[in-house]
Amino acid sequence: MENKYMLSLDQGTTSSRAILFDKSGAIIGVAQKEFTQIYPKPGWVEHNAEEIWESQLEVLKAVLLENHVKPEEIAGIGITNQRETTVVWDKHTGKPIHHAIVWQSRQSIDICNQLKEQGFEQTVREKTGLLIDAYFSGTKVKWLLDHVEGARERAEKGDLLFGTIDTWLIWKLTNGLVHVTDYSNASRTLMFNIHSLEWDDELLNMLQIPKSMLPAVRPSSEMYGYTDEKLFEFQIPIAGIAGDQQAALFGQACFAEGQAKNTYGTGCFMLMNTGEKAVASKNGLLTTIAWGVDGKVEYALEGSIFVAGAAIQWLRDGLKLIEKSSDSEKHALAVDTTDGVYMVPAFVGLGAPYWDMEARGAIFGLTRGTTEDHLIRAALESLAYQTRDVLEAMEADSGIRLQKLAVDGGAVANNFLMQFQSDILNTEVERPRVNETTALGAAYLAGLAVGYWGSKEDIVNNKVVERSFSPDMADEVRQGLYAGWKQAVTATMGYKIRH
């Protein structure tokens, strides 16, 4: 039976998905399941790692069943995942010692402050390309070892394993045979040296994490192992891994230096390919590994915006201003401007390029004339302003002026937002026909490893732009709006939460 399809497992922050692709990169089928978000304390976010696995397995089986595809028709599996989210489990029982600590979760903030006080910031920056922040896995692992009873002793005895979600899923899919991650995920842990491409002893000592917990680190496109035959009575090759944002960069075919994409999801993530050189940021961006493919490692600059789509979800769930997120577009178009209203959605602090953990959300410019339409439009516009903040930092670091921005993620269906994004950047914005670029990137990585696609050229040839948005705003209007945003951000950062 021929290998007809590639299968992507896309394990996201709010749902687990399985997507089937054909040779042209078209979607054959999708199955999705949401899972529980756990909020033990303000600012803390956790997931049940077993529920993540069960939901992922369920959608994997469902997408095959619903599309009448047999396991032996799958050429390979690619895995892409919410990055930084941390699982620690017992290697003998396979049971997690605690809930997974999610990337957004701030519970290791005190550990970060201690590390800064101890003077580790420069070392971390140089070796990992990251900042000391509760966002990254390393401080989450330390928090678990410090707070779960008996965990440190078990870890030191070699009984515990750490993994980001890709590692956890592969461990489960192979029934505990394979403990592995790829360069892109390893580069988000605070424990991996992105220049020497290995776990770094100095960083591990800083975090007091035993090396025996850590997975092997491999390129993003190679054979890692096979699914356990008890799962499907057929062993499917697992051949691609990338963190969700790097996978989207690959899925958008941003293979050349200076090409960039922005993903509009719960958060917003912009990545620019910088080729085989790790560009150190002077403007609050992260230097990260894009992927290891074809025997070489390529790097990216990344700007992480913590709250993007989550601001629209808040309008829906918190304020009950809209019934569904897509309603935001008609409200935004019901007014010509926000009438001077700016929303800075710093619900969990501000990410790139500000990195202010203490900032909280704010709305400025309210008058008696402000309506829900103005508020909703301001929330949408905040996504575009934050993207410009990041792009300006990226252009300054890389010395490259972006010619066009490739976009993907849930919010790109919003034509108002995409046009405003193009206007505020004064840059072409391209929306692809296949919006599932994260899953597509994982499929491409796996497909290259198993020979389903011959080369990156095949991938470039697959790409179809569904719609292009061109700037259509007078420059003085653009600069005036953006100046107002900068003022709002400065004011937001001036207001500190009281503990």
UniProtKB/Swiss-Prot annotation:
Activity regulation info: Activated by phosphorylation and inhibited by fructose 1,6-bisphosphate (FBP).
Catalysed reactions, as listed in the record: glycerol + ATP = sn-glycerol 3-phosphate + ADP + H(+)
Residues annotated as binding ADP: 13, 17, 266, 309, 410, 414
Residues that coordinate or bind ATP: 13-15, 266, 309, 313, 410
Family: Belongs to the FGGY kinase family.
Protein name: Glycerol kinase
HAMAP family associated with the record: Glycerol_kin (MF_00186)
Positions bound to sn-glycerol 3-phosphate: 13, 83-84, 135, 244
Top-level lineage group: Bacteria
Record bears the keyword Heme: no
Entry function: Key enzyme in the regulation of glycerol uptake and metabolism. Catalyzes the phosphorylation of glycerol to yield sn-glycerol 3-phosphate.
Subunit record text: Homotetramer and homodimer (in equilibrium).
Listed GO biological process terms: glycerol catabolic process; glycerol metabolic process; glycerol-3-phosphate metabolic process
Enzyme class: transferase
GO CC list: cytosol
Pathway assigned in UniProt: Polyol metabolism; glycerol degradation via glycerol kinase pathway; sn-glycerol 3-phosphate from glycerol: step 1/1
Gene3D superfamilies assigned to the protein according to its UniProt record, in alphabetical order: 3.30.420.40
Enzyme Commission designation: 2.7.1.30
Biological classification of the source: Bacteria, Bacillati, Bacillota, Bacilli, Bacillales
Pfam families cross-referenced by the UniProt entry: FGGY_C (PF02782), FGGY_N (PF00370)
Chain residues that bind glycerol: 83-84, 135, 244-245
